[in-house]
Amino acid sequence: SDAKSATIYSSWHKNSSTFIDGLIGYGYMENDLTRIVQANPSNPLTGNRGVKQYFTSIKFNKIRDKDNFTSLLFGRFDYGLSKLKSFSESGNAHALRFEEQDLKNKSISFGALTKYKKKIKKGYFLPYGRIEFFENLTPDSEAKTSYVSDPNTTYNYTVKEDYSNSLKLELGFDLNLIDSWYFATSIRRLIKNNKDFENEFAIKVSKPF
């Protein structure tokens, strides 16, 4: 594949605690595709498809420090549009033609994080908690295809997201020691509205040298 892209980024802050970041971009990609059909595996199907991509993202952060507590409120909006060009395969009698297709990706998320900073004998102990809600606003997309040998019969396939929103919960702590050792651990649970979920436990240890 061959890809080119350009992005413009800007950051604005009203004061030292409120930040808004945004970017907008465009990309173009050429993909060389190969498909093998079980009925004729010795003659693979090949094709080339171009994709134009438009995308933007806006992020908001508000930080508040009070005593040993740091609170962060955040939100984000993402939008992307991929315009897939039509193309035809070649190679054998099972070759397909794919029509133009638009793939839209749209989502919004917001949440909060609270961290407590406690000085200990050899450094700092920083426990934290985080909650984030994610709403997937991506619409369905329809793919249309036909056999090159039979262009009058069209087959449709609807591309759907498997869930529309999720809730992420995270607890953890960082341990920064004066002798440069750094420890971090966290446990995270992602709950999706389709009754699916993911659990993650992470440990990180580092020391510069």
Predicted ranges, named:
Residues S1-F209:
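Membrane translocator/pore-forming domains, dominated by Gram-negative outer-membrane beta-barrels
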